[in-house]
Amino acid sequence: VNFVEFDAYFDRFATDVFRLENLQNYAVDAEDAGLKAFREGTARPERSVRTEPWLARIAVTTVAGKIWQRVHVVDHPLTEYLRYEMESYVESQAAGERIRIADRAAAESALSGLGEDFWLFDGDSPKAYAVLMHYDNAGHFVGFDHAVEPAILDRCRHERDVALRHSMGLNTYLASGKAVATTE
């Protein structure tokens, strides 16, 4: 699968898409300017359905009745990157994505078995498929694999269910005050 094909998955799914994120840092070149602004305490440009195609896609598909869900498993204190990402999550949630945060320490035995990051499309349908995301130790994206094998889909479904069960909604997490903790 290439990037064009992967991107098209977000236009083709029928009912739901789920994202599991386990890393504490992602090295994404496209986020460098935003992360720099966050680090310096300057306002970043508006990100909304009017300005960002990704957010518009989420909004259009959720209005059509499709479900976007994401769980990020986090360690405390949060890394600078995760504190920055929480701001992006607020924007994605405003577009319609259901974002949840799982505190690894609060459910360590359950969450320790989660594997690599993935996207699961139409997870409970006979046409389900997953995209397994691969990153190096520094959080740089190195590739992905399209998966339709029953064992892989079963693992992704199980990990989705565990992550959802042991997570809280983004607003609840942000209200807890844990998102302001810093490693610096």
Please name every model-derived segment.
Residues 107-147:
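HKD (HxKxxxxD) catalytic microenvironment of the phospholipase D
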Residues 138-184:
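Signature of lipid phosphatidyltransferase scaffolds
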Residues 44, 49-55, 102-107, 112-114:
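Short acidic (Asp/Glu) patches
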Residues 1-74:
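PLD-like (HKD) phosphodiesterase/transphosphatidyltransferase domain
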Residues 18-22, 69-72, 99-103, 120, ...:
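A structural signal for short, well-ordered beta-strand segments and their strand-loop junctions
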Residues 76-112:
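HKD-type phospholipase D/PLD-like phosphodiesterase module
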Residues 27-29, 78-81, 140-142:
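Short catalytic/ligand-binding loop motif for oxyanion handling, primarily in non-cytosolic enzymes
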